[in-house]
């Protein structure tokens, strides 16, 4: 009975309810791929920042971050194992936020405010990723092309 009610509600989804999750996933992909391009374009500078934050083996860390970004972005773009991709990006983002944007350690008000802004942005992105973990990818996703065309849980 609940399943019938859910399938009836699902068939009455508006256009925006149907397409919004896909565009939301695309926004995440854009954010992470542009971040990857920034890492590639400023490799030495970011490696130096990591060294200054006492992160061991910065080139290896950056390589792992790029792999996580690529895998997570592909996952979100196609909606394939979306929840796994979102968890991967969530873990990477929260670690990066706490490690690299530790605003609570800054004495200068301007620098503290700048780092807080980046930390808050990353924290909000983590919230969006957790929503995707809980709610799934939306209707336009490879995850939803299981046997019988129904949504895989």
Predicted feature locations:
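Extended, low-polarity transmembrane helix blocks
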Residues: 1-41, 58-71, 77-153
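Short juxtamembrane and helix-loop transition motifs at transmembrane-helix boundaries
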Residues: 43-56
């Amino acid at each position: 009975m609940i399943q019938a009610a859910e399938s009836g509600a699902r068939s009455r989804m508006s256009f925006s309810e149907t397409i919004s999750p896909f565009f939301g996933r695309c926004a995440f992909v854009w954010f992470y791929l542009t971040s990857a391009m920034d890492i590639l374009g400023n490799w030495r500078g970011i490696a130096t920042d990591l060294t200054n934050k006492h992160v061991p083996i910065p080139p290896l860390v950056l390589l792992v971050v790029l792999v996580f970004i690529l895998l997570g972005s592909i996952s979100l773009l196609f909606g394939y194992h979306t929840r796994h991709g979102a968890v991967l990006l969530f873990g990477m983002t929260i670690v990066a936020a706490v490690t690299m944007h530790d605003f609570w350690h800054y004495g200068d008000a301007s620098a503290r405010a700048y780092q807080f802004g980046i930390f808050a942005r990353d924290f909000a992105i983590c919230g969006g990723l957790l929503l995707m973990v809980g709610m799934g990818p939306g209707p336009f996703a490879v995850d939803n092309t299981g046997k019988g065309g129904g949504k895989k849980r």
